[in-house]
Amino acid sequence: MIRQELSTSYQELSEELDQVVENSEQADERDKETVKVHGPGILPALDSESASSSIRFSKACLKNVFSVLLIFIYLLLMAVAVFLVYQTIMDFREKLKHPVMSVSYKEVDRYDAPGIALYPGQAQLLSCKHYYEVIPPLRSPGQPGDVNCTTQRVNYTDPFSNQTLKSALIVRGPREVQKRELVFLQFRLNQSSEDFSAIDYLLFSSFQEFLQSPDRAGFMQACESAYSSWKFSGGFRTWVKMSLVETKEEDGREAVEFRQETSVVNYIDQRPAAEKSAQLFFVVFEWKDPFIQKVQDIITANPWNTIALLCGAFLALFKAAEFAKLSVKWMIKIRRRYLKKRGQATNHIS
């Protein structure tokens, strides 16, 4: 509708301009005939009247020029609004494709006891105890001690090699993070044909889930497939500080991952020379802090903001078109007034 009204207005303007040209030519012929009939005595009146009409014509032209400039300015604003609409839609689609990672922290009083799966091989478990804050000095290193931890033995097939049978020692991890609970384990390896000695271990989220699982071998196969494994070497005390990361996937599933910081301290072996042939392993497991890190992908594109911006852009386009239509009508009105005054002046002169 706006385009039809604009085309009609411009057609009326062109017709009025043709009429102005014809009227101006007829007025010039009348002026010439009047000059011929009345002679040179009427020239001063004609000069003054033509001067005033030229001033009015120049003012009308100036107004028309300003109107045309305003129309061009609003056309430019319309182009900017169209570009903003296009850019807004493209940004919204880009944000939908690339969500932003959000990280938050949840404080807990205690953790669900994790499971610590150890693969000692030929190494023997000498002692396992739960302590709080401080580990007392070793009394008889290398000798069997108390095993006050909850442990389970599981044999299962390696998920990456069906021909390998693995034996895992599952230990219940610490819970009381506020009291700085820790688990201290000691192993002894009498003889080894390997050039380097180390014990593998992996961490999984819940020891209770392992106990309640009807298929513990399958449970450990799934854990080994999902979690990474680490090592601690003999002749050192390895201190492992654990932290928990919960990641929410795009399909809504939640995955749990352990992150750890390790510090290694050299063990000063003061045993008799006859006992030093057996290598000792020391490892400590403790929670780093009472904060669970939660990671999820969020979409920053807000559809309501996009809709509001699009509505504003379309409103600007509508207002610009309406102003252009009113400007054309105003120019036609000014032209009609000028033609009316020009006709009255011509009649007065004649």
From Swiss-Prot:
Main location (coarse class): membrane
Residue intervals passing through the bilayer: 65-85, 302-318
Location in or out of the cell: Cell membrane
Key words of the record: Cell membrane, Chloride, Chloride channel, Glycoprotein, Ion channel, Ion transport, Membrane, Phosphoprotein, Transmembrane, Transmembrane helix, Transport
Sites carrying sugar chains: N155, N162
Molecular function per GO: pH-gated chloride channel activity
Signal peptide: none
Bilayer topology annotation: Multi-pass membrane protein
Family classification: Belongs to the proton-activated chloride channel family.
Protein name in UniProt: Proton-activated chloride channel
Organism: Bos taurus
